[in-house]
From Swiss-Prot:
Lipid transporter that specifically mediates export of sphingosine-1-phosphate (sphing-4-enine 1-phosphate, S1P) and sphinganine-1-phosphate in the lymph, thereby playing a role in lymphocyte trafficking. S1P is a bioactive signaling molecule that regulates many physiological processes important for the development and for the immune system. Regulates levels of S1P and the S1P gradient that exists between the high circulating concentrations of S1P and low tissue levels that control lymphocyte trafficking. InterPro entries: MFS (IPR011701), MFS_dom (IPR020846), MFS_spinster-like (IPR044770), MFS_trans_sf (IPR036259). Its main location: membrane. Keywords: Cell membrane, Deafness, Endosome, Lipid transport, Membrane, Non-syndromic deafness, Transmembrane, Transmembrane helix, Transport. This is Sphingosine-1-phosphate transporter SPNS2. SUPFAM superfamilies: MFS general substrate transporter. GO terms for cellular component: endosome membrane; plasma membrane. It is a multi-pass membrane protein. GO terms for biological process: B cell homeostasis; bone development; lymph node development; lymphocyte homeostasis; lymphocyte migration; regulation of eye pigmentation; regulation of humoral immune response; regulation of T cell migration. GO terms for molecular function: sphingolipid transporter activity; transmembrane transporter activity. The gene is Spns2. Disruption phenotype: Deficient mice are viable, do not exhibit cardiac defects or embryonic lethality, and are generally normal and fertile. Deficient mice have decreased levels of sphingosine 1-phosphate (S1P) and dihydro-S1P in blood, accompanied by increases in very long chain ceramide species, and have defective lymphocyte trafficking. S1P levels are increased in lymph from deficient mice as well as in specific tissues, including lymph nodes, and interstitial fluid. Moreover, these mice have aberrant lymphatic sinus that appeared collapsed, with reduced numbers of lymphocytes.
Length: 549
């Protein structure tokens, strides 16, 4: 059967050449190769039946083996050469992917850092924005909520495009777009707060392209523990970029004496990163790391993809758990620096800011803690998952559940400690964020396990939409709204500014506990859904010999 396949693939009269070569070999007393196949030019020599690898010459059209004198050289196609080497011979990876995978992952991670740096630069100068535009907590929370709303609406669109068109071009265009909008927003006059809100919405559209598509490229470059490691690096960019956003916003504001300059740093870096993605990130094939040498069949329709994802219980529960994480991180990231500033005003260790520029110490400290806990959390989560995989195949969702439930305890303690000790509050923030950030990369790895390659961009997009819709799209505004609502029924004082925001933020740990429950539900269905995905991948793969060129 192998001879028939190879003969049909060879060009011009391969069957006749095969018959002539066989007759000549029999006259010389030669035996067929050790692979048991007498085709494809894989001829035994002197009865040994082995041809060394250095006797094969690669050409643009295929490969040709050098044959000792007296034996004719028979050209072979790449598929035939692979068959001659035997079933145990590894398939060579494309050179473009083999050399540039690490660099591509690093550039994509850098782009993710910039996305979150830009997103949380606004939070780093939030008090200045409130004083400059004259808005209360509700208006300040609207900036983040509008950003997330546009982000989640655009995410499914980019997920559809990412499964069907050139992904790195979409990434670069998204970065160029949000960089231009962010830079322009730094020139908005004081009386046009609505323009700043609109600009944040447009930035959300640009950043949606990146967060939706970039993880799927990494998923197509690596597999198994290596993919977990690379996704850990990529998702470490979330807390790192968030922390750098606070630090950049407050530091640039202090250096320039004007908070507007904080919005002019990330656009320059974004333009550079977008260019690097266009030049250095390889155009990987979807499912390259999973298809084991075959080629994926034609992809399914968008409607069929959506139906399959909705029926995937591990995907649904992990998406709901991710929504709880987004709710907490969105609310805490937006309001904790301001909450700690108000705590110090109550403790009379700081003064109320009535005009910008305001103090930046809390944003700097919180940013530094976020950067370090992000690194520690991602590394701890990935390491704990690898260790637990040796003991249970449900390690991924179980580690996430433990991290979420432990984080909820320390988030509660933040509001208890802040009343008397800012240092104690920072310690609780450190532990709580470390546990909360431990599930970023693991959640992405769960998605890669239970979703087939041709649906991953759509799956990431739908998960982003769901997590933002139920999470940080409304949590910053909701916390600000509750805070203002409580203050309306009390006297206007620094104490009630502090207490009202703290009471509103107490909603976060309860949502985090709910997320931990969703991860436990994911663990119930993880193994069966992963097995289904592996079976579907095998059905989608066409063996190389059957692929028409």
């Amino acid at each position: 059967m192998m001879c028939l396949e190879c003969a049909s693939a060879a060009a011009g009269g391969a069957e006749e050449e095969e018959a002539d070569a066989e007759r000549r070999r029999r006259r010389r007393g030669a035996q067929p190769g050790a692979g048991g196949s007498a085709c494809c030019g894989a001829r035994g020599v002197g009865g040994a039946g082995v041809v060394s690898a250095d006797e094969e010459v690669q050409t643009l059209s295929g490969s040709v083996r050098r044959v000792p004198s007296g034996l004719p050289s028979i050209p072979s196609t790449p598929g035939c050469a692979a068959a001659a080497k035997g079933p145990s011979a590894p398939q060579p990876k494309p050179a473009s992917l083999g050399r540039g995978r690490g660099a591509a992952a690093a550039i994509l991670s850098l782009g993710n850092v910039l996305n979150y740096l830009d997103r949380y630069t606004v939070a780093g100068v939030l008090l200045d924005i409130q004083q400059h535009f004259g808005v209360k907590d509700r208006g300040a929370g609207l900036l983040q909520s509008v950003f997330i709303c546009s982000f989640m609406v655009a995410a499914p669109i980019f997920g559809y495009l990412g499964d069907r068109f050139n992904r790195k071009v979409i990434l670069s265009c998204g970065i160029f777009f949000w960089s231009a909008v962010t830079f322009s927003s730094s020139f908005i006059p004081q009386q046009y707060f609505w323009l700043l809100v609109l600009s944040r919405g447009l930035v959300g559209i640009g950043e949606a392209s990146y967060s939706t598509i970039a993880p799927t490229i990494i998923g197509d470059l690596f597999t198994k523990n290596t993919r977990t490691l690379m996704l850990s690096v990529f998702y470490f960019a979330i807390p790192l970029g968030s922390g750098l956003g606070y630090i950049t916003g407050s530091s640039v504001k202090q250096a320039a004496g004007d908070w507007h300059w904080a919005l002019r740093v990330s656009p320059v870096l974004g333009m550079i990163t977008g260019t690097l993605i266009l030049i250095l990130v390889p155009a990987t094939k979807r499912g390259h790391a999973d298809q084991l040498g075959g080629q994926l069949k034609a992809r399914t329709s968008w409607l069929r993809d959506m139906k399959a994802l909705i029926r995937n219980r591990s995907y649904v529960f992990s998406s709901l758990a991710t929504s709880a994480v987004s709710f907490a991180t969105g609310a805490l990231g937006m309001w904790i620096p301001l909450y700690l500033h108000r705590a110090q005003v109550v403790q009379k260790t700081a003064e109320t800011c009535n005009s910008p520029p305001c103090g930046a110490k809390d944003s700097l400290i919180f940013g530094a803690i976020t950067c370090f806990t992000g690194f520690l959390g991602v590394v701890t989560g990935a390491g704990a998952t690898r260790w637990c995989r040796l003991r249970t195949q449900r390690a991924d969702p179980l580690v996430c559940a433990v991290g979420m439930l432990g984080s909820a305890i320390f988030i509660c303690l933040i509001f208890v400690a802040a009343k008397t000790s800012i240092v104690g509050a920072y310690i609780c923030i450190f532990v709580g964020e470390t546990l909360l950030f431990s599930n970023w990369a693991i959640t992405a790895d769960i998605l890669m396990y239970v979703v087939i390659p041709t649906r991953r961009a759509t799956a990431v997009a739908l998960q982003s939409f769901t997590s933002h819709l139920l999470g940080d799209a409304g949590s910053p505004y909701l916390i600000g709204f509750i805070s203002d609502l409580i203050r309306q029924s009390t006297k206007d004082s620094p104490l009630w500014e502090f207490l009202s925001l703290g009471y509103a933020l107490m909603l976060c740990p309860f949502v985090v506990v709910l997320g931990g429950m969703f991860f436990l539900a994911t663990a119930l269905f993880f193994l069966s859904d992963r097995a289904k995905a592996e079976q579907q991948v095998n059905q989608l793969v066409m063996p190389p010999a059957s692929v028409k060129v």
